[in-house]
Each structure stands twice: as C-alpha cells, then as structure tokens.
Amino acid sequence: MARIHARKRGKSGSKRPPRTAPPAWVEYTAEEVEALVVKLRKEGYSTAMIGTILRDQYGIPSVKLITGKKITKILEENGLAPEIPEDLMFLIRRAVNLRKHLEQHPKDKHSRRGLQLIESKIRRLVKYYRRTGKLPAKWRYDPEQAKLLVR
C-alpha cells in the first residue's frame, strides 16, 4: 500500500493478533472496563491515551474484545464524546501550529507545502465525517475559526 502524499510504499508494521475472545488472564469485567474508560475521559484523557493507559497500567489489551464496543462508542453512550472527532482535531491543531510558524517564517516553502498536505487531509476527513453524520452537513474547515477551536 502506498502513502497518501508520496510515491513510496509504507513499511510493514506489527499487527495485533486476531482474537475473538478476551485473553484468559484479563481480570476485568466489561462493566469495570467501561467505568475505567469513563473515569479516564473525565480526567481529560483522549481516546488514544485511554487505550494506552488501559494497556500499560491495567493490563487490558483491547477494550473492544472485553466490552464488545470501541472506546468512542462507550464515550458516546455516556455523553462524553468530543463534538469534533479526535483525528480531525489533531490535524486541525497541526495546521494551526504550522500557520503560526509560517507567519514568522514566510519563506519556508517546505512548511507551506506541508500545510497544503495537512489541509488536504482535513478536507478529505471532513467530507467523510459529513457523509457518515459525525459532523453537521454545514460544517466547514476555516483556518481562522480553527484557531478558536484549538485550545
């Protein structure tokens, strides 16, 4: 499989082993895992960090295997899901930081190209999220408004 904005092929990475049931050594029930996910979200952690913390500190290899639901689904059921999906928010944050850099260094052509690529990814993701209903149909990416979205 090729990269999005390059002509190179990607490097193969490690894959999670295919499983249908949780491992026997996991000591947590589905309700306990859901409570942990909600608690960590209320502490301000992102979904990616929640998964990492559960893996490293609690020994939970996969929330989906134990609960049957992904972390985002659990957060949606408890009303804690972010209004803008996390991957889109991270891309917007990168674009805002790069625009700030380009204000100070206007001749940085390589970074300008990087900004174009990041904003292309943002537009592609917005189109997908509008189609699936995770974003309103009228939602648009605006660089000036993005500064206000990013904390």
Curated annotation (Swiss-Prot):
Disulfide bonds: none annotated. InterPro entries: Ribosomal_uS15 (IPR000589), Ribosomal_uS15_arc_euk (IPR023029), Ribosomal_uS15_N (IPR012606), uS15_NS1_RNA-bd_sf (IPR009068). It comes from the Archaea. SMART domains: Ribosomal_S13_N, Ribosomal_S15. GO terms for molecular function: small ribosomal subunit rRNA binding; structural constituent of ribosome. SUPFAM superfamilies: S15/NS1 RNA-binding domain (SSF47060). Residues 1-18 have a biased composition (Basic residues). CDD domains: Ribosomal_S15p_S13e. One of its GO terms (biological process) is translation. Keywords: Ribonucleoprotein, Ribosomal protein. One of its GO terms (cellular component) is cytosolic small ribosomal subunit. Residues 1-22 are annotated as: Disordered. Belongs to the universal ribosomal protein uS15 family. Part of the 30S ribosomal subunit. This is Small ribosomal subunit protein uS15. The gene is rps15.
